[in-house]
Regions:
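C-terminal motif of bacterial Sec signal peptides marking the signal peptidase cleavage site
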Residues: 6-9
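Bacterial signal peptide processing site
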Residues: 11-14
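Long amphipathic alpha-helical scaffold segments
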Residues: 68-171, 177-186, 196-237
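Beta-alpha junction/loop-to-helix N-cap segments that form part of ligand/metal-binding clefts
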Residues: 167, 186, 192-292
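Periplasmic-binding protein-like
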Residues: 259-268, 285-287, 328-332, 380-407, ...
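Extracytoplasmic ligand/sensor domains, especially the bilobed periplasmic-binding protein
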Residues: 262-265, 269-343, 347-357
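Extracellular/periplasmic periplasmic-binding protein-like sensory domains
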Residues: 414-488
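Segments of small-molecule ligand-sensing domains
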Residues: 474-540
Length: 541
């Protein structure tokens, strides 16, 4: 039965490569998939023909690539004696078999394999693999980056994202020159910051990076034990490519043709999606992260971002270390807030905690209305639903609150929490770096007494000389300090790229956090914690 159905598919394939006398319906794709499923992965020429017949019917890029990858996997698993009986007019199948021969003869020589594939593409221009090579085959054409990679930096250097691209570029290029040494005293004075941009696109990125600032004052961070590692040395020239309004395939082709073997960037998520879907034979350290359901293990693609989800995971870990049992996550009423709450709950439960609770708040204006009416924030919430089995239902009183808010919001949220509970039942308060603007005066610091918050090492007293250097490069715009720190760490990661893929124990004390590598080569940042205590900002105890 399988053979009969597969041969029917072969007839459709043959027609699509010659006269195309019939147009198969989209429903045929499901029909072919049922044949593939019935084969249960057992390699055969019949199933290869079904994959070939199904391929032109798949319009979704992910499904189309999966078809090609599955065909190639099956082909590489077949023994030579199984690859028999190919008709003269089966051009697509003949092309795949020829490509297999090229791969087997050159799989230990990436350069020769690339040359062979390029020649194959000229001989089989209509084969679907000529446009979309199998992912596994692409991986075989990629050489290791090595100790001195030639780096192409993909950033928005014009248009609305220019300010962010420039901050990252400055950190990256300053790291190439080497970081200033840390002074003997680690006491640090954080600089003032400017207003937000007022631009929708820029403000969207600010939401992911930091809050805007509207005062001019200084915040002193007490002596800190946080450190930033020395950066690698690489004298190869770095070329910056402006991604604004540019198509990723053209930029990647230009960079590789000029001899660059590592791309750092792009920054915008849409560009990261585009470069990931290209399946290009070049190593990439993307400066943003895709959603979890879009990540796939690739030996030439890593992700590094200033992820607010990482901060939420940091908070969950910190609370567990301090013995907290019943957390409440207080976030904006938005998809952004939902993402943060989910990330916190997943990490909380992964570390042995029970169900975490969530409560949302509205705009600053609505918070002010509530506080004027004497309405506080009660320590209640709804369970955060995450796909975890066997987690106990939350019980008892809230003993810790993780607040994701801007400074203006936090100045309202904290007293609203205190209004609703007695002083003997007050939970420990934790905030994200979103609330830290480095410009708090003494009144604010006393008002925030006891609040703990996470922050990047560059702004947590790790290296005062480096902070002063950064201050001049980002024009005292405090929100850009974190992006400058990201640029420094992108340099360190780029020059350790081979270790990211091959060393699960890789660690570096970076300017944006303690960096480690998680699944799918996603870089995770662990941040130090600070605390408002007696009118000062000190390392959290």
């Amino acid at each position: 039965m399988l053979s009969t159905l597969a041969l029917t598919g072969c007839q459709i394939e043959s027609s699509t490569t010659t006269t195309a006398t019939q147009q198969p319906s989209v429903s045929d794709a499901s029909h072919y998939q049922s044949i593939i499923d019935a084969a249960q992965g057992k390699p055969s020429m019949d199933v290869l023909r079904v994959y070939i017949s199904q391929e032109p019917l798949l319009t979704d890029p992910a499904q189309h690539q999966a078809n090609i990858d599955s065909l190639w996997l099956m082909l590489t698993q077949m023994k030579p004696e199984q690859i028999q009986g190919i008709e003269a007019d089966e051009n697509i199948l003949l092309g795949w078999v020829d490509l297999l021969d090229i791969y087997q003869n050159n799989k230990d020589d990436p350069e020769a394999l690339r040359t062979g594939i390029d020649d194959w593409k000229t001989r089989y221009p209509h084969n679907p693999g000529a446009k979309n090579l199998p992912t596994a085959l692409v991986q075989g054409t990629i050489t290791k980056v090595g100790a001195n990679p030639r780096i192409a930096l993909f950033l928005p250097m014009s248009g609305q994202g220019q300010v962010f691209g420039q901050a990252i570029m400055q950190g990256f290029l300053d790291a190439q020159k080497g970081l200033p040494s840390s002074p003997v005293s680690q006491a640090s004075t954080a600089p003032a910051a400017s207003q937000g941009s007022g631009n929708d696109v820029l403000d969207q990125i600010y939401q992911e990076v930091a809050a805007t600032v509207n005062e001019n004052a200084n915040t002193e961070v007490a002596s800190s034990t946080v450190s930033i590692d020395a950066v690698p040395t690489n004298t190869q020239s770095v070329k910056v490519f402006d991604t604004q309004g540019k198509a990723m395939p053209q930029l990647v082709a230009q960079a590789t043709s000029e001899g660059y073997n590592l791309i750092v960037g792009p920054l915008l998520k849409s560009d990261v999606q585009a470069i990931a879907q290209m399946n290009a034979p070049v190593n990439v350290l993307a400066l943003n992260e895709l959603d979890a359901n879009q990540l796939q293990p690739r030996t030439n693609l890593c992700y590094f971002s200033l992820s607010p989800e990482d901060e939420a995971k940091n908070a969950a870990n910190q609370m567990r270390l301090e013995g907290k049992q019943m957390p409440l996550v207080l976030v904006p009423a938005s998809p952004f807030g939902d993402r943060i709450a989910k990330a916190f709950a997943e990490e909380w439960q992964a570390k042995g905690g029970g169900t975490a609770l969530m409560q949302t708040f509205g705009s600053t204006a609505s918070l002010k209305e509530s506080i004027n009416r004497g309405q506080g924030i009660r320590m209640t919430g709804t369970p955060i639903n995450v796909a975890t089995q066997g987690v106990e239902q939350a019980n008892g009183s809230i003993d810790a609150v993780y607040i994701v808010a801007t400074r203006d919001e936090l100045t309202l949220v904290k007293p609203m929490i205190e209004m609703a509970i007695s002083s003997r039942q007050r939970p420990a308060l934790y905030a994200s770096s979103r609330s830290n603007q480095g410009n708090s005066n003494a009144d604010y610091r006393f008002e925030m007494e006891g609040v703990k918050f996470s922050e990047v090492p560059l702004l947590a007293g790790a290296n005062n000389n480096l902070r002063k250097q950064a201050q001049g490069k980002v024009n005292n715009d405090y929100s850009l300090f974190r992006l400058y720190a990201m640029g420094i760490d992108a340099w360190s990661l780029a020059n350790n790229y081979d270790n990211l893929q091959n060393n699960g124990q890789f660690r570096v004390n970076g300017a944006s956090g303690m960096l480690s590598v998680h699944e799918n080569c996603v870089i995770y940042r662990e941040l130090p914690w600070l605390q408002f205590k007696q009118g000062q900002v000190k390392p959290a105890q």
